[in-house]
């Protein structure tokens, strides 16, 4: 509330958009599991929205599908330039120790769990992610490292 946060400095439009109807709309997504626990699922921020062929795809949904694969330990999903779809979906993944997987296998697996237009078109496998101070993946740095033109 206003005792903690009055708004964004010199950004009245952003402040008005974020504070609506007496609520602070953070853009955080969550879900309740069958035991009633609330799980953080990512952000529903416009800047994270990927639009392949004009469709709306949230990275958190694609990440959940990828993490269902038994060989995948961590993943970060983001949009990249794509010659066909204007924006393509890219996944950067860390595999669990002792597991092997190629991009075709992962894309086929994900296609069984989410709509075809939401599956990643590009996949990179890496050994580690750059991390933020809190230990979470540094999404901006990962996109900077792996988000250039795709082949």
Kindly give the residue locations of the regions a language model identified:
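AMP-binding/adenylate-forming catalytic core of the ANL superfamily
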Residues: 1, 6-7, 17, 29-118, ...
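Active-site loops of AMP-binding adenylate-forming
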Residues: 11-14
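FAD-site-proximal beta/loop scaffold in flavoenzymes
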Residues: 22
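A structural signal for the hydrophobic beta-strands that form the central parallel beta-sheet
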Residues: 25-26, 40, 125
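AMP-binding/adenylate-forming catalytic domain of the ANL superfamily
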Residues: 115-136
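Acidic/polar alpha-helix N-cap and adjacent early helical turns
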Residues: 144-151
